């Protein structure tokens, strides 16, 4: 199934978090925090500003982004957990 977000929404897939610390301790799944980084899989067309002009989003497919632990709405698509969130819920784009 393919998702096409509407308006100023983006589809993000969480990046897997390390399950082992630098000292070699393995962190069990139930003790690990949700990762707060992800990859943008799809972006909506944008939204209209107060003047009625159309404004495109500042993120693009493939961008690595930071967001809050509880940001967005989780949806399952073909067995993958994805997040649907507004662009304003993103904190930053991580540089390459």
UniProtKB/Swiss-Prot annotation:
It comes from Leptothrix cholodnii (strain ATCC 51168 / LMG 8142 / SP-6). One of its GO terms (molecular function) is protein folding chaperone. Gene3D superfamilies: GroES chaperonin (2.30.33.40). The gene is groES. The keyword Nucleotide-binding does not apply. SUPFAM superfamilies: GroES-like. Keywords: Chaperone, Cytoplasm. Belongs to the GroES chaperonin family. PANTHER family: 10 KDA HEAT SHOCK PROTEIN, CO-CHAPERONIN GROES. This is Co-chaperonin GroES. Its main location: cytoplasm. One of its GO terms (cellular component) is cytoplasm. CDD domains: cpn10 (cd00320). Together with the chaperonin GroEL, plays an essential role in assisting protein folding. The GroEL-GroES system forms a nano-cage that allows encapsulation of the non-native substrate proteins and provides a physical environment optimized to promote and accelerate protein folding. GroES binds to the apical surface of the GroEL ring, thereby capping the opening of the GroEL channel. One of its GO terms (biological process) is chaperone cofactor-dependent protein refolding. Heptamer of 7 subunits arranged in a ring. Interacts with the chaperonin GroEL. It is found in: Cytoplasm.
């Amino acid at each position: 199934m393919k998702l096409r977000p509407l308006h100023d929404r983006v589809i993000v897939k969480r990046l897997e978090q390390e399950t082992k610390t630098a000292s070699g301790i393995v962190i069990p799944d139930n003790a690990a925090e949700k990762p707060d980084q992800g990859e943008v899989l799809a972006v909506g067309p944008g939204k209209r500003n107060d003047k009625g002009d159309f404004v495109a989003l500042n993120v693009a497919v493939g961008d690595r982004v930071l967001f809050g632990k509880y940001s967005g709405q989780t949806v399952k698509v073909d067995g993958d957990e994805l997040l649907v969130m507004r662009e304003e819920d993103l904190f930053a784009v991580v540089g390459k």
